[in-house]
């Protein structure tokens, strides 16, 4: 919005030409989201407290968590509002990728909001059933995947529609452009063609998997939001490179027209995340809830797909991956041993993995900060793939 306004007025006020620069708008988007989050945070927390939207704490978990019972949850609304306002203010409204990421983010946020609402208002600890939640995640993920399959390699929605029609008329068979290949990090010009079906399946798995992985990681004060900020910021750097015909050519990446605008969204997400951390740091004044975790995870996955960095997301988001794998291993091993020995056995003291470390004697703040440090290292490895190829 401000970009269009500045372009309209820049002939009379030349200083407004600075708004045309993507990097300037990215910085302003970050600061705008940060200020909105910090300013609105106390009011949001107060309202959530008045509405008695409190977190229920499981008694089977670490006993130190019992004092958190009743802490306001659904604070992810603050993050999403900050991101949405800042992005709309500073982005180019004509950019199709911005709207795809925004719709996925808000769509997954809506799923999380319904889940949280049922838990805290109806006092139903189950919230949405797994089947219902998975259905809506799948629907949104597949719609985004189908659109992105034809959008990543094209420069306009008209070209996207033409490519889609070619796919349909060709009997659902189409040679996808090079830009839609799966990029292998650390190897120069090594990529694998996915085809339309492969692209859709991979995109779906990345978006849904990332959403659920971030949600599983959200279990301690401040644990998940800093990795989201770090990974989101790094993906913003990839978006800037892929969207630039100069930098993408120099660094041997495919040029994806319009991808650079995602730097605005990623910057806003980082700013909103830091603002939320101000209130979510131990001892937390508010929890994110599914409304925030599902949305932010879906956003990371969608951005990673657009900038063709699915594998790099897997690396930088290693904490999310390990947390998810720990749950899968725990459940699988429990079922196997119950069938074989008549009673279920556990690989970890408790899953996800952060609870295992807590029950092993680590303090909550130690787990959180150490997971942050690991994420910082993984993000640096991910960023190194920009040049080390």
From Swiss-Prot:
Does the keyword Glycoprotein belong to this entry? Answer: no
> Where is this chain's protein located in or outside the cell?
Cell inner membrane
Specify where it is mainly localized: membrane
Q: Name the GO terms of the biological process aspect.
A: cell division; cell wall organization; peptidoglycan biosynthetic process; regulation of cell shape
Any one GO MF annotation of this record: phospho-N-acetylmuramoyl-pentapeptide-transferase activity
Tell me which domain of life the UniProt entry assigns to the organism this sequence originates from: Bacteria
The record's GO CC annotations read: plasma membrane
**Membrane topology annotation:** Multi-pass membrane protein
| E.C. number(s) listed in UniProt | 2.7.8.13
What InterPro entries does the annotation carry? Glycosyl_transferase_4, PNAcMuramoyl-5peptid_Trfase, PNAcMuramoyl-5peptid_Trfase_CS
**Which terms are listed as keywords in the entry?**
Cell cycle, Cell division, Cell inner membrane, Cell membrane, Cell shape, Cell wall biogenesis/degradation, Magnesium, Membrane, Metal-binding, Peptidoglycan synthesis, Transferase, Transmembrane, Transmembrane helix
Q: Give the metabolic or biological pathway.
A: Cell wall biogenesis; peptidoglycan biosynthesis
Q: Which residues cross the membrane?
A: 25-45, 74-94, 97-117, 134-154, 190-210, 222-242, 259-279, 286-306, 311-331, 366-386
Q: Which reaction does it catalyse?
A: UDP-N-acetyl-alpha-D-muramoyl-L-alanyl-gamma-D-glutamyl-meso-2,6-diaminopimeloyl-D-alanyl-D-alanine + di-trans,octa-cis-undecaprenyl phosphate = di-trans,octa-cis-undecaprenyl diphospho-N-acetyl-alpha-D-muramoyl-L-alanyl-D-glutamyl-meso-2,6-diaminopimeloyl-D-alanyl-D-alanine + UMP
Spell out the Pfam families in the cross-references.
Glycos_transf_4, MraY_sig1
What EC class does the entry list? transferase
Q: Which cofactor does it need?
A: Mg(2+)
Q: What does this protein do?
A: Catalyzes the initial step of the lipid cycle reactions in the biosynthesis of the cell wall peptidoglycan: transfers peptidoglycan precursor phospho-MurNAc-pentapeptide from UDP-MurNAc-pentapeptide onto the lipid carrier undecaprenyl phosphate, yielding undecaprenyl-pyrophosphoryl-MurNAc-pentapeptide, known as lipid I.
Question: What family, per the record?
Answer: Belongs to the glycosyltransferase 4 family. MraY subfamily.
Q: What is this protein called?
A: Phospho-N-acetylmuramoyl-pentapeptide-transferase
Species this chain originates from: Cupriavidus pinatubonensis (strain JMP 134 / LMG 1197)
User: What does UniProt list as this organism's lineage?
Assistant: Bacteria, Pseudomonadati, Pseudomonadota, Betaproteobacteria, Burkholderiales
**Underlying gene:** mraY
């Amino acid at each position: 919005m401000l970009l269009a306004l500045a372009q309209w007025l820049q002939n009379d006020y030349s200083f407004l030409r600075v708004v045309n620069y993507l990097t300037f708008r990215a910085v302003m988007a970050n600061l705008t989201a940060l200020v909105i989050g910090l300013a609105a945070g106390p009011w949001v927390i107060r309202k959530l407290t008045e509405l008695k939207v409190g977190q229920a704490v499981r008694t089977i978990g670490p006993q130190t968590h019992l004092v958190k019972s009743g802490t306001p949850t659904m604070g992810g609304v603050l993050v999403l509002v900050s991101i949405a306002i800042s992005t709309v203010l500073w982005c180019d409204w004509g950019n199709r990728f911005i709207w795809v990421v925004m719709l996925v983010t808000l769509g997954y946020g809506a799923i999380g909001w319904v889940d949280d609402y049922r838990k805290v208002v109806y006092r139903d600890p189950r919230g949405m059933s797994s089947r219902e939640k998975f259905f809506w995640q799948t629907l949104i993920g597949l719609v985004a995947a189908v659109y992105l399959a034809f959008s990543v390699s094209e420069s306009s929605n008209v070209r996207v529609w033409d490519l889609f029609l070619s796919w349909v008329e060709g009997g659902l068979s189409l040679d996808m452009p090079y830009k839609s290949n799966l990029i292998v990090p650390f190897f120069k010009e090594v990529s694998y063609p996915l085809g339309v079906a492969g692209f859709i399946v991979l995109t779906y798995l990345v978006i849904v998997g990332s959403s659920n992985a971030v949600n599983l990681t959200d279990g301690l004060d401040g644990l998940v939001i800093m990795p989201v900020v770090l990974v989101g910021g790094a993906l913003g750097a990839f978006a800037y490179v892929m969207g630039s015909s100069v930098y993408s050519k120099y660094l041997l990446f495919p040029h994806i027209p319009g991808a650079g605008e995602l730097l605005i969204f990623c910057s806003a997400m980082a700013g909103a995340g830091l603002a939320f951390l101000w209130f979510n740091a131990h001892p937390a004044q508010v929890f994110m809830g599914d409304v925030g975790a599902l949305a932010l995870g879906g956003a990371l996955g969608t951005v990673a797909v657009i900038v063709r960095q699915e594998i790099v997301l897997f690396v930088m988001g290693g904490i999310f991956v390990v947390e998810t794998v720990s749950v899968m291993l725990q459940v699988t091993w429990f079922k196997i041993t119950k069938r074989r020995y008549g009673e279920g056995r556990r690989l970890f003291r408790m899953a996800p993995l952060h609870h295992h470390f807590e029950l092993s004697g680590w303090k909550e703040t130690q787990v959180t900060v150490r997971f942050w440090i690991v994420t910082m290292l993984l993000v640096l490895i991910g960023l190194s793939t920009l040049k080390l190829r």
